[in-house]
Structures are given as C-alpha cells and as structure tokens.
Amino acid sequence: MGNCCRSPAAAAREDVKSSHFPASAGKKKPHQARNGGVGGGGGGGGGGGGGGGAGQKRLPVLGEEGCELIGGIDDKYALDRELGRGEFGVTYLCMDRDTKELLACKSISKRKLRTAVDVEDVRREVAIMRHLPKSASIVSLREACEDEGAVHLVMELCEGGELFDRIVARGHYTERAAANVTRTIVEVVQLCHRHGVIHRDLKPENFLFANKKENSPLKAIDFGLSIFFKPGEKFSEIVGSPYYMAPEVLKRNYGPEIDIWSAGVILYILLCGVPPFWAETEQGVAQAILRGNIDFKREPWPNVSENAKDLVRRMLEPDPKLRLTAKQVLEHPWLQNAKKAPNVPLGDIVKSRLKQFSRMNRFKRRALRVIADHLSAEEVEDIKEMFKAMDTDNDGIVSYEELKSGIAKFGSHLAESEVQMLIEAVDTNGKDALDYGEFLAVSLHLQRMANDEHLRRAFLFFDKDGNGYIEPEELREALVDDGAGDSMEVVNDILQEVDTDKDGKISYDEFVAMMKTGTDWRKASRHYSRGRFNSLSMKLIKDGSVKLVNE
C-alpha cells in the first residue's frame, strides 16, 4: 500500500526523532553535522517558513525567544517514549541530564513549518508562555531551543491524563466536580486576559491533570493559537475548533470574549455530555452556533440546578458585549458556592456521553493526523508555484486583477466553483488581495475537498490487511500506538457508534460518515482549518446567515 499506509508515528520519527534520540539508553549521542539535520532533503517551506533543501542550513525559528543547540537536543536531555503527536511534531517524555528531572519535550519539525504563518505561530506560542506568570493551572515552559531539524519546547510533565478521561474513570460525577473544573478553566482565562492574551483554542483536550492523584491540579497545556491583544482590539482570523467557536469568530470581528464562550461550551459538555451546538456538517455546526439555541430539556438538564443553567446561559450569550467577563463568571453564585453545589451524580447518561465524546475524538484525531501527514511537499510546492506565477509584480500578494488573470492561465486546473471561492475570498477580506498564507489556506481547502483521496488514505492506514474493513484488532493496534492504552473496551465503544450495520467492523462508508459528522478539522491541519472555516464564513456571509457589522 506504499506511503498511504505509512504511520504518522513513522513520519514524525523521520522528521524529528532521528535527529535527537540517544543512540542507546542513557548515553550521549555524538554531535551531528550541521547540514545533516532532519528533513534536509525536500519539503521546501513557502512564504518564509522554516524549510530548506538538501545541504541548506535551515533558518532559525525562535530567534531571541530561544537558544540554539549546536549538537542536538540530547546534549541536554535524554528523550524516551512518545507521549503524543500533533500536526507539526511529537511530544516525548524526557529527562534533564543534569538534574534527572522528568519533563515533556514537544519537538516541532522545521520541515513541517511550511509558511511564515507556521513559524510565527511557534514563535508566538513561546513568547506567550514566557509572558504569562507562573500559575498552578498553566503548564510551565522550562526551555525553548532549536537544532538543525526541530524546535524543542521543554515543559513541565503532566501525567494525569485528559480532562474527560479522568471524569469518565471516576465512579461519582457531580455538579460539584463540574464546578471545580470550570473554575480552573476560567481562572486560566482570567489570567490570560489580565496579561493581554486571548487563548483562542479552549477545549477539553488542551487541559491535562498534572498527576494521577485525586487532588491533582488541572493545567492548560497548549497556547499554539493564542495571541497578544490590546484593549478594544479586534481580530478577524478564523481559528479554533468548531464546537467551541464563538459566533463573532464566524463574523470575523472578535476579542477576548471568545474565550468565555468556549469555556461555556466546555461547561455545557461537562454537565450533559454533548456539545450545545452540534450538526452533521461543519456548516450545520456554524449555523447552530449563530442561532444560539441552547437545549435545557433533554436529560440530565431537568435535574441540573438553576444556578448552573443560568451560568451556562450567561457564558453562551451571543452578544459579546453582554457576555460575562472572566471575573464575573468567577463571582457567579454557582462557582462562589461550588462546595455547596449538588453532590448527587448527574447520572450514567452523562458519563456515557463523555466517554463516547472523548473516545470518538481520539479515533478522529488519529485519522485526521494521517490525512495531515500525507499532504505532500509536492502539493504545497505546486500551490507555491501557482502563487508566484499569479503574482506578476512580485510584491508578495495576489491582487484581484492578478487572480482573475491567473485563473484564466491555470483555468484547466480549477473547477468553476473553486474559481468562485477564490474570488469570494478576495472580495470579502477587505484587502482586495491574497497574501501567500491566505492563498495556501484556501488552496489546501480546495484540494482536500475536491475528492475523497485523503479519507481513503486514512482508511487504508487502519485497514492493515487491505480487506476493505477496519477490524477490531486493527483499530486497537492503531489506538495503542496513539497512547490510548491496550483496551478493547475503547474499541468496542467506538464500534458501537461507528459500525451502523453491526457486522463487527467498520466499512469505508461508515468511516467516511464518522469523519464528516461534526469533524474537528483543526486537528487535521491548521492551514486546512483556516482555509475551510474562512470559506465557510464566506458562504454564510453570502447566504445572509452572517451579517458583517462594525460592533
């Protein structure tokens, strides 16, 4: 099956691990040649990214934000097992060679930093983590450094597991527990806002428990989409995860209030086990968010306290001017009296929903990373060349006229609907031009939606024997690789949801249906998310669902 069955783990190791894993346990690795770093061959980075060809020295990513490692990461840290992986890199358990302290090292492959946007995201993540004061609720950054092949963020180790997993594992889940979690999340938001930072991607997966103790602190771990802001400043870039996205994000006019909305979505899920705004498609999710109708009728809401429901309503207030601030949320009676909140179990239905939500996310995350991993350098390079050809005056942007002219030149490669989408992008962004990052994002969206090739590749990754079905053992092995634990219980829960014809295995059609139901495309690709939701926003603007106003 060739490259389509290449594990994301293998790809990540090729990009990152080979440049810094110790040759043998506990031993230092000899200094590597400067030009022999990871990704030296192929994978050019467009628009100022961290890429470079064979024999080329890669440009520094961190600059003043980090230190440069001449010999590689293992001069200072011994890296061990993989803890997780994302779009750009892999997180490893590591040990400080001097102090023997166990830490986590997030290694970001420079080869995957394809554009200036990617590089700036990493640089800003480090700057924000350094800017925020130390807090028991935020993972601490010990060091940021880079070598030839990767950027390494060495952080405090959190071994207590994800938020929902801990809740599901407990035999007794109550409003009181939900209130304690909510307080921690909103305290993180308050700290960020006080120090001029919007998180922009609050979701359960971005919170881990520090350890496995019952009283372990909950910590925010990911600031990859966070941004600095000044009072009154508004942003238009669409980022974040669909379920947790505030309506003003879709309207392209937002400020720090979006973090309260996202925290409100998490609270709603904590209390009932499902998102408040859900649909079969991304457009359906977006329209549900814009309608803002909150369901308090289904189980277990009749048994939830009025104070809890009042706080949910106020956090999910569609008008950001009327939405509670972090300070007001923390002063709300439900949180002020958290110790008096009902300690009666919310019921098995909530735990069951949370477990399903968590495990389906894990399966989708795995599949989406396979999709992201197989966006080839050639695909990106083709887009880059098209951009250069259209940018006839070489000013780094494609104007409306250049786009129209370029589309005529490249017309055979673009369907009419795709041409229209690109033109709409220019018409609605207010600049009458596309920079490379915008052009790339929209183009990636067009490529991915043009056919099911990427979904087929992801399916074949799981279908190891090529018989046309993902069988229980194949699914179990893939999820074990992804750190889900060697548990058939997880597999059976996923099968129960995805295997609609109940034949004990997952067909391609069942897999596609799962992937297209409320899928969180942010986990597939940051570029894809930006392109997809910018395109979706344009569509909603065009059909009148979204009104662009100066708020």
Curated annotation (Swiss-Prot):
The gene is CPK3. InterPro entries: CDPK_Ser/Thr_kinases, EF-hand-dom_pair, EF_Hand_1_Ca_BS, EF_hand_dom, Kinase-like_dom_sf, Prot_kinase_dom, Protein_kinase_ATP_BS, Ser/Thr_kinase_AS. Its EC number is 2.7.11.1. Ca(2+) 4 binds at residues 499, 501, 503, 505, 510. This is Calcium-dependent protein kinase 3. A lipid is attached at residue 2 (N-myristoyl glycine). It is a lipid-anchor. CDD domains: EFh (cd00051), STKc_CAMK (cd05117). One of its GO terms (molecular function) is protein serine kinase activity. Residues 1-57 are annotated as: Disordered. It catalyses: L-seryl-[protein] + ATP = O-phospho-L-seryl-[protein] + ADP + H(+); L-threonyl-[protein] + ATP = O-phospho-L-threonyl-[protein] + ADP + H(+). SMART domains: EFh, S_TKc.
